[in-house]
Amino acid sequence: MLTMKDIIRDGHPTLRAKAEEVPLPLSTEDRQLIDDMLEFLKMSQDEEQSRKYQLRSGVGIAAPQLNHKKRMLVIHFYDEKKGDYVTHQLINPKIISHSVEKSYLPTGEGCLSVDEAVPGIVHRYARITVKAYTPDGEEVKLRLKDFSAIVAQHEIDHLNGVMFYDHIDKADPMKVQKDAIAVE
């Protein structure tokens, strides 16, 4: 079981390294890792488990955050509009197309690897198409928008050694780009 102790923090060199492609089919070790990542997110969102194991709630996690330079990520959150969970375990994800239109979270973004709040607006593509593989080796193309697109871009950034705060305008952190859409 993964805990907060397994998550490396801002300043660790792995967070700034480009992660490597993962060979398919997945090794037993890689399969265990991506399944543990999903379990962590589920437990972090469960009030009782989160309190018991002192987990910070997360909606996404990438293998580099666990000090594995591998192109794997997991997204898991409850989508109120759909009335269901959005869950993706992705191997070697690539953004193959995106909208011109940008979106952002008005409250800013956070990260399991960054302990302190970093105020500022992070602009992301409003819609993206991601090509990736499932843990079973099946190729998938996901069309994501709104919160799903923001979370996916945040996690894919981790695979490329980019932190969310790298996108914040240093001169005017709360500046919203013209025509950018707020995602509530």
From Swiss-Prot:
Cofactor(s) needed: Fe(2+)
Residues noted as binding Fe cation in the record, renumbered to the chain: 111, 154, 158
Keyword annotations of the record: Hydrolase, Iron, Metal-binding, Protein biosynthesis
Single GO term (MF): metal ion binding
Catalytic activity: N-terminal N-formyl-L-methionyl-[peptide] + H2O = N-terminal L-methionyl-[peptide] + formate
BP GO terms, sorted: co-translational protein modification; translation
Enzyme Commission no: 3.5.1.88
Active site positions, chain numbering: 155
Cofactor note: Binds 1 Fe(2+) ion.
SUPFAM superfamilies listed in its UniProt record: Peptide deformylase
Pfam families: Pep_deformylase
Role: Removes the formyl group from the N-terminal Met of newly synthesized proteins. Requires at least a dipeptide for an efficient rate of reaction. N-terminal L-methionine is a prerequisite for activity but the enzyme has broad specificity at other positions.
Protein family: Belongs to the polypeptide deformylase family.
Designated name of the protein: Peptide deformylase
Organism this protein belongs to: Macrococcus caseolyticus (strain JCSC5402)
